[in-house]
């Protein structure tokens, strides 16, 4: 869909309305700033967040070169082959690649779980416009497009958005727009979105309070937000990015040195900071006072059995024990509604 047909978009610099003047350029009517457009994907990042290294440019050029003759899976593999994994242990390289390849199927399971749990707590005002923050290669976009009139995918990385663009083309999605942007400063008018969702994303955005404030700004009255958040104090499974147990129990300033000592990898490379139950609770309460919940997610959405889901349902209904269990459970499901 053309950018000019999405009137909720605003300039990240001044907040003015955006117009599409040329096929490869988007301009602000108010301040005159121009924003480049690649394959119909506008770059609406604030200037201070634009850092283009040689490696990033190289990956994008490779994907654009093979784009016309490639399918979604081929682009995923090409994208992964261009990443600098020289300092990453081999077992993690294999894990990252498999994670990417199966991300769309997992994204559909997450999307359905999010909406099912949300509808049991807070009714959506309508099913008009949904936005996925950190959409990456398009994990949840297909499923969202079946529920909402229009879907917007946001990610700061152009290379992954190019891969997502191919997925949308393969499934002939007409009700979707991809935008290179950041969650901390969304290029949307206030009170414009019905639903915001984020899969495996919160731990990669360190300014969680700012992120939640932006969600509250752009959601319309009654609009809702859902996200999963891996627990910093998970007792049961290894840290999801480096596969080491109990990393979150260390002081944050020690984590990088510990991970490097154990597996020879710089933890900052994964750009992750897992949230505890209390971290997540504080962020939700500040932006969505009294209209938020932290629930147990379905284990089946992560590849677990439905039998575990049944046990989790029992646990979640035990007074006192349910909240205590959330402190150490592997993952949290955050729900919120704007009043």
Give the positions of each predicted feature.
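Conserved N-terminal segment of class I S-adenosyl-L-methionine
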Residues: 2-189, 195, 329-333
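Class I S-adenosylmethionine-dependent transferase superfamily signal
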Residues: 144, 214-215
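Active-site micro-motifs of SAM-dependent methyltransferase domains
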Residues: 185, 203, 232-234
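A short SAM/SAH-binding and catalytic strip from SAM-dependent methyltransferases
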Residues: 194-206
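Helix-to-beta-strand junctions that scaffold the AdoMet/dcAdoMet cofactor pocket
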Residues: 205-206, 219-221
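S-adenosyl-L-methionine-dependent methyltransferase catalytic module, highlighting the catalytic core
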Residues: 209-214, 224-335
């Amino acid at each position: 869909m053309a950018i000019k047909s999405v009137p909720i978009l605003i300039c990240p610099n001044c907040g003015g309305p955006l117009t599409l003047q040329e096929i490869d350029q988007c301009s602000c009517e108010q301040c005159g700033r121009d924003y480049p457009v690649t394959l119909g994907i506008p770059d609406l990042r604030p200037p201070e967040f634009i850092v283009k290294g040689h490696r990033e440019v190289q990956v994008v050029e490779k994907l654009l070169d093979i784009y016309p003759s490639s399918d979604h899976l081929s682009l995923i593999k090409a994208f992964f082959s261009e990443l600098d994994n020289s300092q990453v242990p081999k077992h993690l390289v294999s894990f990252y690649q498999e994670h990417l390849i199966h991300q769309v199927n997992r994204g559909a399971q997450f999307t359905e779980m999010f909406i099912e749990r949300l509808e049991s707590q807070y009714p959506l005002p309508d099913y008009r416009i949904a936005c996925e923050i950190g959409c990456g290669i398009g994990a949840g976009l297909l499923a969202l497009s079946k529920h909402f009139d229009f879907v917007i995918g946001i990610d700061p990385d152009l290379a992954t958005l190019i891969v997502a663009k191919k997925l949308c083309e393969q499934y002939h999605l007409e009700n979707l727009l991809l935008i290179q942007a950041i969650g901390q400063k969304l290029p949307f008018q206030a009170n414009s979105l019905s639903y915001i969702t984020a899969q495996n994303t919160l731990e990669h955005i360190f300014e969680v309070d700012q992120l939640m404030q932006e969600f509250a700004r752009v959601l319309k009255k009654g609009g809702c937000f859902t996200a999963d958040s891996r627990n910093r104090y998970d007792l049961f499974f290894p840290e999801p990015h480096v596969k080491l147990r109990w990393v979150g129990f260390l002081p944050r300033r020690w984590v990088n040195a510990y991970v490097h000592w154990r597996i020879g990898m710089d933890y900052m490379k994964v750009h992750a900071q897992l949230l505890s139950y209390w971290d997540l609770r504080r962020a939700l309460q500040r932006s969505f006072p009294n209209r938020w919940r932290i629930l147990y997610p379905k284990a089946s959405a992560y590849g677990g059995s439905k039998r575990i889901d049944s046990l989790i349902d029992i646990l979640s209904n035990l007074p006192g024990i349910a909240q205590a269990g959330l402190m150490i459970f592997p993952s949290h499901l955050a729900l919120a509604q704007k009043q």
